Amino acid sequence: MYIYNCIFTGKEVFSDAYPHKLEDEGFVWVVDGKYEELADQKFDDSLFGGNKSAEGEDDEGEASTEYKPVVNTLLRAFRLEEPVTITSLNDFKKALKKYTVNLMAKLNESNQSRVAVLKSKLPKYAKQWAEDFDKIRVYVTEGDGFEVEGTLVVITQDVPFGEEKPNDKCKMTVLADSLIKEKF
């Protein structure tokens, strides 16, 4: 099994346990995920101060009002966080610029030939993400939600965000040069 870690934070971004492919001549990883219902989590009135015995209610014959959350398998498995500092398109552009500058500096140290690839291919993705900003979500690795010092992870899906149901599909896109492949 291989784990793909952020080159900056060292934290997990994804693993080969999920369907994935290297696209655009090795520029981006696209990872397939889905939404699933958390069967082990139960939410009922007791979480919010409800006490059926004190209220004089009888459990018999009452319909269950349990809530089972639907979660993104990629976000859950790798503990990706939505950065609190990216709330608008302008915030996203600033974060992407900072990320790009940091990635180019890292590539200048380790693999200078990839800087030209980054400069030539990234504008296409940046333009698409900016145009579709209301249809994407940006995530970072665990613990990077405030500083946003590491890899930016873009999630897209076929259904509007907030309307997910079990088995709805999603895709993660991440720049290949911002990851380190590690055998686990």
From Swiss-Prot:
Location of the protein in the cell: Cytoplasm
Matches recorded under InterPro entries: Mss4-like_sf (IPR011057), Mss4/transl-control_tumour (IPR011323), TCTP (IPR034737), Translation_control_tumour_CS (IPR018103), Translational_control_tumour_p (IPR018105)
Gene Ontology annotations for the cellular component aspect, listed alphabetically: cytoplasm
GO molecular function, one term: calcium ion binding
Keyword presence, Transcription regulation: no
Domain TCTP: 1-184
Top-rank taxon, per record: Eukaryota
Tissue expression as described in the entry: Concentrates to the body column, with no detectable protein in the head and foot region.
Alphabetically ordered keywords of this record: Calcium, Cytoplasm
Pfam families reported in the protein's UniProt record: TCTP (PF00838)
Predominant location: cytoplasm
The UniProt record lists the keyword Glycoprotein: no
Function: Involved in calcium binding and microtubule stabilization.
Protein family: Belongs to the TCTP family.
Record's protein name: Translationally-controlled tumor protein homolog
Organism expressing this protein natively: Hydra vulgaris (Hydra)
Organism phylogeny: Eukaryota, Metazoa, Cnidaria, Hydrozoa, Hydroidolina
